């Protein structure tokens, strides 16, 4: 493969990660593999052991293992089955006897004795396996499990957004677990604090605090601000001055410093927080307290005299009498609590209760209608928040709680603690007092906590697996109740279908398990990197507001700000940014380079939104010298999500790349920074709709991301390790090691004409040659929409921005006939058709070529077995699979009786049920698959297909064995040459020196018979050869068995025949095209090349776009792309001309001039010889590829330099001539080279014409829609139009013979056949339908003409109105 190099205008400092690593790592955490540890064992351990409830037996988990899949990925797609592996677990049944195994301290039994132990390995179900590309194959269809962004477990604080009558916001707190009951706290308008469990009826928080075991004294200690007053020697009471407690207080007494005695502030003054802090800063620590102020305060602790007597209990409200007696009591200190602002204590005072009352009240709310006991209430309350079986915060929730409240609990503690609840209540009380801030749920991080996290496929599978095992455990308990433990085995208690059904339900019906978008490699990779806020446990798109959809500052480098759908889900479905990854807690991280002492280093670290808040981060474009030191004294940075200028010494991190804020699709748009955001969004989305073309072409103006996307998509074949290509053909590549010490063989199989989910063609082409050395990671074969290892979604066209005869009005596109003639935008689509052969009640259906009643012209593509031949050209209406179905016998006629009497057998009565090619489809049969039911002997075409598959496998095996044999014999030859022969083997005699020429005269298999000194090493080599030979043979024998194996088909199905037809779609008017900047349009006309506008040298343009489509859309990036593309295109023409002239010195100087600003390429060119430079220049004949990276593309002066170098006007405009008149246009026109895509909205899939077709059974009107081969509806408004013009006869035709007048239709047909113009109208069938509906209402309405006799109904006894 010739290497693909682009002209870069920036430097790539940080390589890209595996683009589907998110999916792979997440699923690996579930099933294990690589460095990941399987979580299946942990889930088993959390559910097992399962006890029968009576202490008779226990079923324990020992271990589990995953088996191997029955078929490979493609085999599952072919057969329409799930790519999965069996899960087997070793379970141990422990049966207990009546005896005890020991005694307690007083002779009480401790545990029953083990009577019997039985272990067994049990099949638990099939677990879907992720393919190497990060997808799942479910029922033969590739699916993707989209990652979901949801609220992270933990505590959230918010307000109700609506102010109360007093103008104050009421605050709420919510503790949300990953699994378990929600706990909400909220204030009402009267500042009373309530709590709810699972959004049930609210209760005063007193009940919760009492249930947690708190007394009033504990509540004072936990939630109240206690003021300790001390009695001085002169008989005055002093209190500690705390600025926060004096905030907003109007003094009721003179504020006097107790230490100095000076007056600080006079009575009546109001103290602000600023004033309070200033007083504290000036040394005010203690102040005198007036006894009158103590009135109405509460005792926080028992008032105890010096003798230890309790004078007043805690919680006592001080009255005038109490205050008056204080100076006479024998106390020197008192602890007081003020009711104002202490919402929790005020709630306790209003709604006080005992521990038992609290427990019973909570039980009644959780389980209304049940009669509670204190024991059951305690058990329920304990299980709600403190039981690991029913409550789980995950390590994320624990980390967030620890960070929010400065706790130090271990990550493994994933249940609530009392301290968590106390801290939440305390924080909420502070918020109600307007101290602190609420959380921003749209943050990916807020202060010291992250609020939104991502859960991927591994976590979903964890949850489903747990649900399945819990259900299975319930069934096990039920089975244990009736089991005979003397004989029962573990397998008899397990129903393996339960687990498989839960997992299958998730993959088949979950909103996050989606049919993979497989239009092109970019759509695949984008789908795998998608993050949805919808789905179970997520948002509802109908109720999601603007805030949650909007771009947030924390999305920087984590979620793409550009790529999102345009419809109702805008902002709810996003894509990961290029460099972003998800950490073990589910938070999205983005990489940054360390900056130390003003020097940007190459050391990279990943930061989440939590870690990033307090960091100073500069942009990737910051100016640095050669050693990485920042040049500017003040640097533009982000800190706490605000943009600030800071000294360079304070910079901590730098972005790794300017493009790290965009997604994969957006990073493929050159000059993205010059496009309006809405058009950039459209450009990102429309690239995913581009159809792979027959001859893909990489863009001349790319972004440098094309190669990374091609590799990451899995559409190309990449070398696993360095070696030499030993063999290639259209379907196989064999690479072997270059080293003879550690020999290996890698065999690669290419995909050929495989159908994708969206009917595009997956076809791989080999790009290496035999004998070529390849490195690890080199591309061996291109896939669909890939050229030379780079993504190639469209073609480079010469474009002119020009209004041309009205044909490009309103974004229409005019195309040259050259584009169609050269098949530049021709694509191949695969249509799959399936014929199912069933065993009916009257007998089995049969596949045959002998189909009665079908003309031979429709059977031309069938072989002798009745199945279409591969390579046959088929048209609409042709039979792809001939099939007949038995039908019930009709009464026997005398003629049939005579035939039976003569021939002695009954003629089988069958009907045609063949598979026909539907209307609007024509193409070539490229593949046929025949699947047969297990137990039925393979016949006909099935055997032929099986033989072809086995022959292909044998050929692949023979190639590998040939490579191995050549390698072994080359080693043997090296070992023999130069040695003395110890025996005779003609023409070598005993004692002769063995030479290479002599060995060539002997059959290679006979070389082993030669005896030399080092015979032991030769024997070891032969053993290695035999072992490796057997290993290869064994592998392929297993493949042969899989091919020969039967297929598991549905009940009653004998055979399934799948026929794949390749349909070629050429470009035609009505097809949709677009660029990469959101500039889309429909082809209005394909103009002959000679009529297209042409340049001064006679070159006609390929496509004409409307210049009015640029200013209003504000996607100026397409103009810059056009200019740069024009320079690249003409530089290629210039190089081609110099090569043809043989002027190699100018070629070299031109190449060096082009790449002079690309440091990496210049270093490479300096290492190349003149001959190598000329050879490289031959690959640039079609244009010099350039990379205009996002936010780091070439500036205007660089584009002008390249245009001048190419010999073009630096303005990018050219003189154009009209191809029709030959006249020059009035002014210069913008002409350039632009990358255009053909989208999958093809006119062939939308338009059709009906001549004859089916009718509706009831109304007898033609059906509607292309799938029913329907007609155009002449509706109500169209009738009005004909009425308005007075076209009565035309209207009558439309409503009768052209619609549902059955008799009239037949008459018209007869008239046409006879050549007459006379016909008459009948009654439309819809009129009869209306009449029958009236009769169904018991209204017998008859319509008569005026000429018919009218009956007299006057004598009938009818009720007359008004009598």
UniProtKB/Swiss-Prot annotation:
<keyword id="KW-0240">DNA-directed RNA polymerase</keyword>
<dbReference type="InterPro" id="IPR007645">
    <property type="entry name" value="RNA_pol_Rpb2_3"/>
</dbReference>
<dbReference type="GO" id="GO:0032549">
    <property type="term" value="F:ribonucleoside binding"/>
</dbReference>
<dbReference type="InterPro" id="IPR037034">
    <property type="entry name" value="RNA_pol_Rpb2_2_sf"/>
</dbReference>
<dbReference type="InterPro" id="IPR007121">
    <property type="entry name" value="RNA_pol_bsu_CS"/>
</dbReference>
<dbReference type="InterPro" id="IPR015712">
    <property type="entry name" value="DNA-dir_RNA_pol_su2"/>
</dbReference>
<dbReference type="Pfam" id="PF00562">
    <property type="entry name" value="RNA_pol_Rpb2_6"/>
</dbReference>
<dbReference type="Pfam" id="PF04560">
    <property type="entry name" value="RNA_pol_Rpb2_7"/>
</dbReference>
<comment type="similarity">
    <text>Belongs to the RNA polymerase beta chain family.</text>
</comment>
<dbReference type="GO" id="GO:0003677">
    <property type="term" value="F:DNA binding"/>
</dbReference>
<dbReference type="InterPro" id="IPR042107">
    <property type="entry name" value="DNA-dir_RNA_pol_bsu_ext_1_sf"/>
</dbReference>
<dbReference type="GO" id="GO:0000428">
    <property type="term" value="C:DNA-directed RNA polymerase complex"/>
</dbReference>
<comment type="subunit">
    <text>The RNAP catalytic core consists of 2 alpha, 1 beta, 1 beta' and 1 omega subunit. When a sigma factor is associated with the core the holoenzyme is formed, which can initiate transcription.</text>
</comment>
<dbReference type="InterPro" id="IPR007644">
    <property type="entry name" value="RNA_pol_bsu_protrusion"/>
</dbReference>
<comment type="function">
    <text>DNA-dependent RNA polymerase catalyzes the transcription of DNA into RNA using the four ribonucleoside triphosphates as substrates.</text>
</comment>
<keyword id="KW-0804">Transcription</keyword>
<dbReference type="InterPro" id="IPR007641">
    <property type="entry name" value="RNA_pol_Rpb2_7"/>
</dbReference>
<dbReference type="InterPro" id="IPR007642">
    <property type="entry name" value="RNA_pol_Rpb2_2"/>
</dbReference>
<dbReference type="InterPro" id="IPR037033">
    <property type="entry name" value="DNA-dir_RNAP_su2_hyb_sf"/>
</dbReference>
<dbReference type="Pfam" id="PF04565">
    <property type="entry name" value="RNA_pol_Rpb2_3"/>
</dbReference>
<keyword id="KW-0548">Nucleotidyltransferase</keyword>
<dbReference type="InterPro" id="IPR019462">
    <property type="entry name" value="DNA-dir_RNA_pol_bsu_external_1"/>
</dbReference>
<keyword id="KW-0808">Transferase</keyword>
<dbReference type="InterPro" id="IPR014724">
    <property type="entry name" value="RNA_pol_RPB2_OB-fold"/>
</dbReference>
<dbReference type="Pfam" id="PF04563">
    <property type="entry name" value="RNA_pol_Rpb2_1"/>
</dbReference>
<dbReference type="Pfam" id="PF04561">
    <property type="entry name" value="RNA_pol_Rpb2_2"/>
</dbReference>
<dbReference type="GO" id="GO:0003899">
    <property type="term" value="F:DNA-directed RNA polymerase activity"/>
</dbReference>
<dbReference type="GO" id="GO:0006351">
    <property type="term" value="P:DNA-templated transcription"/>
</dbReference>
<dbReference type="InterPro" id="IPR010243">
    <property type="entry name" value="RNA_pol_bsu_bac"/>
</dbReference>
<dbReference type="InterPro" id="IPR007120">
    <property type="entry name" value="DNA-dir_RNAP_su2_dom"/>
</dbReference>
<protein>
    <recommendedName>
        <fullName>DNA-directed RNA polymerase subunit beta</fullName>
        <ecNumber>2.7.7.6</ecNumber>
    </recommendedName>
</protein>
<dbReference type="Pfam" id="PF10385">
    <property type="entry name" value="RNA_pol_Rpb2_45"/>
</dbReference>
């Amino acid at each position: 493969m010739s290497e693909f190099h682009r002209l870069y205008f920036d430097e790539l400092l940080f390589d890209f990660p595996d683009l589907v690593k998110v999916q792979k790592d997440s699923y690996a955490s579930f099933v294990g593999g690589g460095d990941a540890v399987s979580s299946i064992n942990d889930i088993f351990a959390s559910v097992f052991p399962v006890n029968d409830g009576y202490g008779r037996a226990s079923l324990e988990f020992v271990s589990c293992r995953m088996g191997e899949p029955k078929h490979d990925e493609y085999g599952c797609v072919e057969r329409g089955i799930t790519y999965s592996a069996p899960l087997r677990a070793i379970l141990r049944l422990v049966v207990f006897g009546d005896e005890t195994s020991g005694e307690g301290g007083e002779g009480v039994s401790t545990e029953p004795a083990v009577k019997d132990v039985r272990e067994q390995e049990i099949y638990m179900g099939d677990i879907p396996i992720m393919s190497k590309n990060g997808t799942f194959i479910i029922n033969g269809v590739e699916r993707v499990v989209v990652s979901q962004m949801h609220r992270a477990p933990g505590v959230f604080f918010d307000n109700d957004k609506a102010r109360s009558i007093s103008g104050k916001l009421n605050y709420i707190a919510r503790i949300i677990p990953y699994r378990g009951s929600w706990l909400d706290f909220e204030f009402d308008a009267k500042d009373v604090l309530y709590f709810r469990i699972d959004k049930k009826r609210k209760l005063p928080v007193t009940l919760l605090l009492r249930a947690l075991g708190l007394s009033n004294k504990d509540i004072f200690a936990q939630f109240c601000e206690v003021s300790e007053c001390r009695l001085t020697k002169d008989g005055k009471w002093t209190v500690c001055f705390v600025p926060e407690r004096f905030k907003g207080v109007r003094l009721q007494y003179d504020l006097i410093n107790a230490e100095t005695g000076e007056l600080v502030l006079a009575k009546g003054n109001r103290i602000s927080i600023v004033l309070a802090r200033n007083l504290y800063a000036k040394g005010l620590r203690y102040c005198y307290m007036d006894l009158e102020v103590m009135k109405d305060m509460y005792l926080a602790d028992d008032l105890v005299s010096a003798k230890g007597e309790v004078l007043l209990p805690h919680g006592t409200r001080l009255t005038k009498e109490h205050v008056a007696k204080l100076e006479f009591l024998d106390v020197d200190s008192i602890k007081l609590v003020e009711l104002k602002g202490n919402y929790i204590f005020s709630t306790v005072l209003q709604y006080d209760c005992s521990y038992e009352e609290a427990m019973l009240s909570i039980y009644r709310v959780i389980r209304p209608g049940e009669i509670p006991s204190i024991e059951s209430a305690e058990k329920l309350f304990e299980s709600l928040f403190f039981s690991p079986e029913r409550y789980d915060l995950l390590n994320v929730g624990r980390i967030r709680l620890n960070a929010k409240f400065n706790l130090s609990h271990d990550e493994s503690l994933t249940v609530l603690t009392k301290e968590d609840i106390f801290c939440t209540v305390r924080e909420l009380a502070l918020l109600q007092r307007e101290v602190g801030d609420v959380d921003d749920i749209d943050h990916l991080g807020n202060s010291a906590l992250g609020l939104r996290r991502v859960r991927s496929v591994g976590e979903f599978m964890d949850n489903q697996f747990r649900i399945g095992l819990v259900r299975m455990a319930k069934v096990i308990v039920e089975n244990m109740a009736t089991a005979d433990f003397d004989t029962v085995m573990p397998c008899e208690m397990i129903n393996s279908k339960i687990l498989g059904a839960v997992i299958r339900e998730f993959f088949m019906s979950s909103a996050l398990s989606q049919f993979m978008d497989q239009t092109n490699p970019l759509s695949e990779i984008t789908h795998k990197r998608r993050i949805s806020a919808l789905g179970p446990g997520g948002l509802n798109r109908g109720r999601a507001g603007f805030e949650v959809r909007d771009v947030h500052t924390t999305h920087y480098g984590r979620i793409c700000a550009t790529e999102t759908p345009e419809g109702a889900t805008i902002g709810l479905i996003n894509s990961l940014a290029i460099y972003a990854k998800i950490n073990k807690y589910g938070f999205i991280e983005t990489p940054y380079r360390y900056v130390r002492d003003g020097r940007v280093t190459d050391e990279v670290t990943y930061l989440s939104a939590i870690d990033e808040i307090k960091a100073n981060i500069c942009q990737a474009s910051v100016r640095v010298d050669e050693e990485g030191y920042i040049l500017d004294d003040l640097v533009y940075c982000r800190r706490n999500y605000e943009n600030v200028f800071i000294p360079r010494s304070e910079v901590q991190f730098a972005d790794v790349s300017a493009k790290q804020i965009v997604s994969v699709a957006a990073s493929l748009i050159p000059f993205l920074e010059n496009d309006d955001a809405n058009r950039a969004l459209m450009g990102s989305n429309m690239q995913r709709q581009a159809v792979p073309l027959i001859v893909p072409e990489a863009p001349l103006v790319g972004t440098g991301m094309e190669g990374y996307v091609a590799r990451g998509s899995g559409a190309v074949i990449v070398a696993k390790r360095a070696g030499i290509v030993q063999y290639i053909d259209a379907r196989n590549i064999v690479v072997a090691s270059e080293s003879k010490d550690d020999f290996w063989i890698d065999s690669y199989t290419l995909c050929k004409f495989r159908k994708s989910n969206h009917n595009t063609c997956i076809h791989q082409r080999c790009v290496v040659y035999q004998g070529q050395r390849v490195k690890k990671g080199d591309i061996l074969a291109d896939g669909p929409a890939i050229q030379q290892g780079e993504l190639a979604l469209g073609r480079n066209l010469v474009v002119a921005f020009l209004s041309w005869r009205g044909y490009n009005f309103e974004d229409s596109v005019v195309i040259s006939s050259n584009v169609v003639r050269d098949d530049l935008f021709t694509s191949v689509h695969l249509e799959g058709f399936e014929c199912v052969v069933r065993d009916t009640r009257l007998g089995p259906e049969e596949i045959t070529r002998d189909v009665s009643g079908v003309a031979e012209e429709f059977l031309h593509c069938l072989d002798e077995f009745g199945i279409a031949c591969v390579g046959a050209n088929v048209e609409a209406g042709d039979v792809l699979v001939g099939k007949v179905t038995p039908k019930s016998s009709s009464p026997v006629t005398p003629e049939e009786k005579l035939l039976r009497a003569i021939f002695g057998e009954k003629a089988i009565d069958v009907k045609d049920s063949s598979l026909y090619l539907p209307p609007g489809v024509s193409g070539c049969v490229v593949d046929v698959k025949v699947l047969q039911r297990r137990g039925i002997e393979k016949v006909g075409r099935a055997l032929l297909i099986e033989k072809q598959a086995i022959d292909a496998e044998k050929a692949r095996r023979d190639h590998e064995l040939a490579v191995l044999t050549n390698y072994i014999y080359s080693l043997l030859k090296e070992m023999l040459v130069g040695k003395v022969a110890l025996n005779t083997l003609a023409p070598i005699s005993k004692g002769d020196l063995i030479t290479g020429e002599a060995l060539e005269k002997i059959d290679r298999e006979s070389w082993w018979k030669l005896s030399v000194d080092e015979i032991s090493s030769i024997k070891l080599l032969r053993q290695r050869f035999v072992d490796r030979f057997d290993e290869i043979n064994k592998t392929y024998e297993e493949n042969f068995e899989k091919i020969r194996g039967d297929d598991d088909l549905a009940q009653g199905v004998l055979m399934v025949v799948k026929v794949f037809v390749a349909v070629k779609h050429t470009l035609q008017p009505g097809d949709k095209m677009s660029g990469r900047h959101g500039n889309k349009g429909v082809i209005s006309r394909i103009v002959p090349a000679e009529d297209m506008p042409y340049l001064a040298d006679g070159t006609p343009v390929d496509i004409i776009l409307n210049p009015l489509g640029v200013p209003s859309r504000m996607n100026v990036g397409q103009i810059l792309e056009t200019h740069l593309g024009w320079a690249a295109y003409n530089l290629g023409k210039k190089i081609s001309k110099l090569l043809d002239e043989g002027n190699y010195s100018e070629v070299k100087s031109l190449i060096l001039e082009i790449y002079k600003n690309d440091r990496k390429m210049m270093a490479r060119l300096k290492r190349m010889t003149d001959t190598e430079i000329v050879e490289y220049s031959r690959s640039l004949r079609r244009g010099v590829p350039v990379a205009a990276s996002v936010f780091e593309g070439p500036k205007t002066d660089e584009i002008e330099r390249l245009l001048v170098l190419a010999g073009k006007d630096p303005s990018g405009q050219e003189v154009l001539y009209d191809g029709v008149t030959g006249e020059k246009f009035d002014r210069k026109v913008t002409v350039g080279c632009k990358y255009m895509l053909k989208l999958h909205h093809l006119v062939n899939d939308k338009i059709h014409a009906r001549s004859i077709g089916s009718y509706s059974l009831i109304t007898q009107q033609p059906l509607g829609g292309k799938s029913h081969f329907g007609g155009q509806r002449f509706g109500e408004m169209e009738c009005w139009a004909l009425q308005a013009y007075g076209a009565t006869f035309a209207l009558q035709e439309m409503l009768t013979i052209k619609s549902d007048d059955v008799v009239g239709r037949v008459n018209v047909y007869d008239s046409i056949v006879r050549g007459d113009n006379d016909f008459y109208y009948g009654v439309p069938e819809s009129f009869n339908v209306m009449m029958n509906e009236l009769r169904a209402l018991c209204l017998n309405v008859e319509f008569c003409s005026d000429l018919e006799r009218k009956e007299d109904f006057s004598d009938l006894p009818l009720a007359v109105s008004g009598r």
